[in-house]
Design a protein with these regions (language model features):
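Gram-negative outer-membrane beta-barrel transporters
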Residues: 449, 542, 551-553, 570-657, ...
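Acidic, small-polar-rich N-terminal luminal/periplasmic segments of exported/outer-membrane proteins
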Residues: 46-187, 532
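Acidic/polar loop-and-plug regions of large Gram-negative outer-membrane beta-barrel proteins
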Residues: 226, 230, 243-249, 253-312, ...
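Membrane-embedded beta-barrel scaffold of Gram-negative outer-membrane proteins
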Residues: 308-312, 316-324, 328-336, 491, ...
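Structural signature of Gram-negative outer-membrane beta-barrels, strongest in the C-terminal barrel
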Residues: 247-251, 255, 361, 380-384, ...
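C-terminal beta-signal and adjacent terminal beta-strands/loops
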Residues: 649-656, 674-721
Length: 721
């Protein structure tokens, strides 16, 4: 590993990635320029630019008219797609003041979970965890994206259920697609957002965009930074992010978009949890940080580059090409397990697992597709065919989590990492994944109101594991599989659709990049889902509602041991059934309501575990609540003054597979008020966790929980000019 990376700076890499992108994109663009008839179809490129600009949600919470990318690449709206999708607009993110992606997605129907130092992607949907994360439609490794400032996104899409037909190996429960803010030729205001909150926390966002050269080039640029603390001693988080994009109108038919995103993050003394006292949360320990080492940190950096060519060759044929590159590095240096029961002295706590580890991740790939929009046998038909090539390299370093010591429970000693262990990280495994895939979709209109969406993907993947250390070992495996989806959609009216869908998927039994040598020969997990639902607008488009019922099943899977997160247990079959409902109302210009609720009945069907061995059949998986619900209401007494309240309910869940340790349900309340001083300047105040409720939202070890942040206040100013 280079000294530059150890110093929290990603080393400069050769520019051949950028050159490759341009070579892939520009030859096609040149053809488009040559073939362009500017008099006959000059409006077509203008229309495409308008579509690109308006594909983001225009209202705060309504999303059925939005063109989505997460469930189909055919350019269908949410209403037209026979899958359950939620779209969170940039306006909603800003109005709620979401500081993180966790805050953005946790209010989506059925979403539950947490992002924490030890469980960076422990979100669940439809009874399964984790979820997949995509950036502009590309499934992206690592957890750095989840730490990034959400003000850089034009919208965030949430798909419930498998996404394998679009992305190959993908989480069964659902996927989240982060769509960056895009350049357009229409005027975009200059944006300034600043917030000052509890614990001397600050955050800043600057944004601008618009035309560089009339009808030739446009840009979008966003810059953000934050420095925040919490009620937990010594914990401090700093983030920096710059993202930008250039849009070139190569001809009346061709558009080229180049985007670059750079993220930096460092958290000193991250909170790893609080030890339980006789199985209960002790309020007096709420603010104590047992990971108070003088050099404790988590730091990461990531760079993403994408080049997208959209060529509208004829009114019936489109070519799309997307080159993508991602490089991320993240390192940890912490002590993370705390047990009162293991201490030999009264009034002390044992802390162990002094971990020094790092992830080094690189992904490069290219996706190309052709879209045909022409009648078939007299019926409207839209068809896409394409291929996807990618290569990912992953290097994992660890010190094995040694070290143990006892410290006073009320005042743990603050010392350096080396006092707990002298063991430093070393290479553990190097994994390479080479993948190619072919995919197709077809939306066939059987009648004016009845359509059928079919999707098929073939995936071929070569994996190579190099296990490093005292006993070096190599292993290789080839995976080849096909997945498909089929779903009819029927328009009861112009604004109300009902649909059904059956989709299959594949998922690794565990993360392929963290398999042990003995696990590399295991088959992939099989995923199947049935879904029926309805979605529509009503009351003169003042209301939107969605309803989905589903059954989701996985065979031959692994689940993390609830008491030992680094240990995996084999499960033969797990099934989840449930219902999800969302409602959005705009009764008047002064009122806006958004509500959703989800019931999840997740159970193990075939699972034996524990010591001694026993059946867990019929038990609920750990960390999966049965009910979740969200309600957001906004009232404007005047045109300038707004009041917002948000309620969130998460039902009880178990922290173990035996269903013996139960985590109680909780309800939180957030309040906000804002005032538009002038047409360009607005100010406001937010209060999070108004009731200062004390509750645990996750258990990382048997006798250790993550306690939710205490009440916080934030004042903010937003300027648009």
């Amino acid at each position: 590993m280079s000294a530059a990376r150890l110093g929290f700076v990603t080393p400069k890499k050769p520019p051949y990635y950028l050159i490759t992108a341009l070579l892939l994109s520009l030859p096609n663009a040149a053809l488009a320029v040559g073939a362009c008839d500017k008099t006959e179809k000059s409006s077509r490129c203008e229309d495409s630019l308008t579509v690109q600009a308006s594909s983001q949600p225009q209202s705060t919470y309504g999303s059925l008219e939005v063109v989505t990318q997460l469930a189909s690449r055919l350019g269908l709206t949410n209403l037209e797609t026979p899958r359950s999708i939620d779209v969170i607009s940039a306006q909603a993110i800003q109005q709620r003041g979401d500081k993180s992606l966790a805050a953005v997605v946790e209010r989506a129907p059925g979403m539950s979970g947490v992002a924490s130092p030890t469980l960076s992607n422990n979100f669940s949907l439809r009874g399964f965890r984790p979820v997949s994360w995509l950036y502009n439609g590309v499934e992206t490794p690592g957890s750095t994206l989840q730490l990034a400032d959400p003000s850089h996104y034009g919208s965030v899409e949430v798909l419930r259920g498998p996404g394998s037909v679009l992305n190959g190996l993908s989480a069964a429960g659902g996927s989240v697609n982060l769509l960056s803010r895009q350049p357009t030729f229409s005027r975009q205001p200059i944006e300034f957002d600043y917030g000052l909150s509890s614990y001397n926390s600050q955050r800043l966002h600057l944004g601008a965009g618009g035309t560089l050269v009339d009808d030739v080039a446009a840009y979008r640029l966003d810059v953000s930074g934050s420095d925040s603390g919490t009620n937990v001693q010594y914990e401090r988080d700093k983030q920096k992010r710059v993202s930008g994009a250039l849009l070139f109108k190569l001809s009346d038919y061709a558009l080229l978009t180049l985007s670059l995103d750079r993220m930096l993050n460092r958290t000193n003394n991250p909170y790893y949890g609080t030890p339980l006292m006789e199985g209960n949360i002790a309020r007096e320990l709420r603010d104590i940080n047992y990971n108070n080492l003088t050099d404790s940190r988590i730091q990461s950096n990531a760079t993403s580059f994408q080049a997208s060519l959209d060529w509208f060759t004829t009114p019936e044929i489109e070519l799309h090409n997307q080159f993508y590159y991602y490089s991320g590095f993240r390192e940890w240096r912490n002590v993370e397990r705390f047990r009162i029961s293991a201490a030999t002295q009264p009034g002390y706590v044992n802390r162990d697992s002094f971990g020094a580890l790092a992830h080094d991740d690189d992904l490069i790939g290219n996706r190309s597709s052709l879209v045909f929009d022409r009648p078939l046998g007299g019926f409207d038909n839209r068809f896409i065919v394409g291929f996807d090539l990618s290569k990912r390299r992953f290097q994992y370093y660890s010190n094995g989590f040694p070290g143990s010591e006892e410290v006073p429970l009320q005042a743990p000693i603050r010392e350096s990492f080396s006092q707990g262990t002298a063991s430093q990280r070393s290479p553990v495994r190097h994994v390479t994944q080479n993948q190619y895939a072919a995919f197709m979709e077809d939306r066939f209109s059987l009648t004016e109101r009845l359509t059928l969406l079919g999707q098929l993907r073939y995936n071929h993947m070569d994996m190579d594991w190099h296990f490093q250390g005292p006993q070096e070992e190599r292993s290789a495996q080839t995976y080849a599989f096909s997945v498909w989806s089929l779903g009819p959609s029927y328009a009861l009216t112009d604004n109300i659709n009902i649909y059904a869908n059956y989709t299959t998927g594949k998922e690794p039994g565990n993360d392929l990049f963290f398999l042990s040598p003995a696990q590399t020969g295991l088959p992939l997990t099989r995923v199947r889902q049935w879904e029926v639902g309805a979605k529509g607008q009503f009351w003169d488009n003042k209301g939107e509602a969605t309803l989905a019922l589903y059954e989701l099943r996985k065979d031959n899977l692994f689940v993390p041991n609830a008491q030992q997160p680094d240990t995996l247990n084999a499960v033969g079959q797990q099934t989840s059934r449930g219902v999800e409902l969302s409602l959005m109302l705009r009764p008047s210009d002064r009122w806006e309501l958004a509500a959703n609720a989800a019931y999840t009945h997740a159970r193990y069907d075939e699972y034996r575990g524990g010591n001694p061995l026993r059946s867990y059949n019929g038990n609920r998986p750990a960390y999966i609540p049965d009910w979740t619900a969200n309600l957001t209401a906004r009232y404007m007494p005047t045109e300038q003054w707004g009041l917002t309240s948000s309620l969130r309910y998460v039902g009880s869940s178990y922290n173990d597979d035996a269903n013996q340790r139960k985590m109680p349900s909780y309800t939180t309340l957030d309040l906000a008020t804002d005032y538009q001083i002038t047409r360009t300047v607005g100010v406001g105040v937010r209060i999070r966790n108004v009731t200062n409720q004390l509750y645990a939202y996750q258990r990382t070890y048997p006798d250790q929980v993550l306690i939710a942040p205490s009440r916080t206040y934030e004042s903010f100013i937003s300027v648009r000019f």
